[in-house]
């Protein structure tokens, strides 16, 4: 696909859920561009539409109305199989609950999406090994998920997401099931991926993690109500810490 223009372009995207004749407006007119190599945080309270927006970006759901363009291609009229193909090649997912397959080893979990892409055995081995090395989990390749800590499982999930070299990484509360130490370790890994050129869109309700992005997009009741640079939020947070007698964040 062509890389000119924004990687992601949303114009007036709306999403309505219908249950028992009740309409729930999850998204009410989203306008959003994400550039190649950008790190964007989608922030807001529970129920504001963050995960719905991420599902649409990842082609797991379709908008009720509006336009979604990915890499200069409209996704509006794609068949289910076309959406699945693009999702497998263009998008890497990182979930809150890791979603690793329990009876597969670490290596097999990372390799599996590459198998679905029809890659040769040698190419799968190369990419899987590189992905595990990138997240510091190559030494655990033969272990099962049950033999890993939560932080280690999330690292494996990140390796699985980046192994296919996707155009964008979509992370849905990637620190939600982790303690603060492991959460910060995963966020540092995300920052390393971004410094390496990855395009990242992360959903989070935690301002400590949102502020590490290039740009923070605030959602409330299905609308973008504010955008700010992550650096601005970091400056505010550091000043608050200083006034409270603590050192600046790293």
Q: What feature does the model see in each segment?
A:
Residues 6-213, 219:
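ABC family nucleotide-binding domain
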Residues 223-247:
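Conserved beta-strand-loop-alpha-helix hinge in the C-terminal portion
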């Amino acid at each position: 696909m062509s890389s000119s223009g924004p990687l992601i372009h949303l114009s007036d995207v709306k999403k309505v859920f219908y249950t028992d004749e009740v309409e729930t407006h999850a998204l009410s007119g989203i306008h959003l561009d994400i550039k190649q190599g950008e790190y964007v945080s989608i922030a807001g309270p529970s129920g504001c539409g963050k995960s719905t927006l991420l599902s649409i970006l990842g082609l797991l759901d379709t908008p009720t109305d509006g336009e979604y363009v990915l890499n200069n291609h409209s996704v509006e009229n794609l068949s289910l199989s076309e959406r699945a193909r693009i999702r497998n090649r263009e998008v890497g997912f990182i979930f809150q609950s890791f979603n690793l397959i329990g009876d597969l080893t670490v290596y097999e979990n990372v390799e599996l999406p590459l198998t679905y892409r029809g890659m040769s055995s040698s190419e799968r081995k190369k990419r899987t090994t590189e992905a595990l090395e990138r997240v510091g989990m190559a030494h655990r390749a033969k272990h099962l998920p049950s033999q890993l800590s939560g932080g280690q499982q999330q690292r494996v999930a990140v390796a699985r997401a980046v192994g296919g070299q996707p155009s964008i990484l979509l992370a849905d509360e990637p620190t939600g099931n982790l303690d603060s130490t492991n959460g910060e370790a995963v966020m540092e890994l995300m920052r390393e991926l971004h410094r390496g050129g990855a395009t990242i869109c992360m959903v989070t309700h935690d301002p400590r993690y949102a502020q590490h992005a290039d740009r923070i997009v605030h959602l409330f009741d299905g609308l973008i109500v504010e955008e700010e640079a992550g650096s601005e939020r970091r400056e505010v947070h550091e000043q608050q810490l200083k006034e409270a007698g603590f050192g600046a964040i790293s």
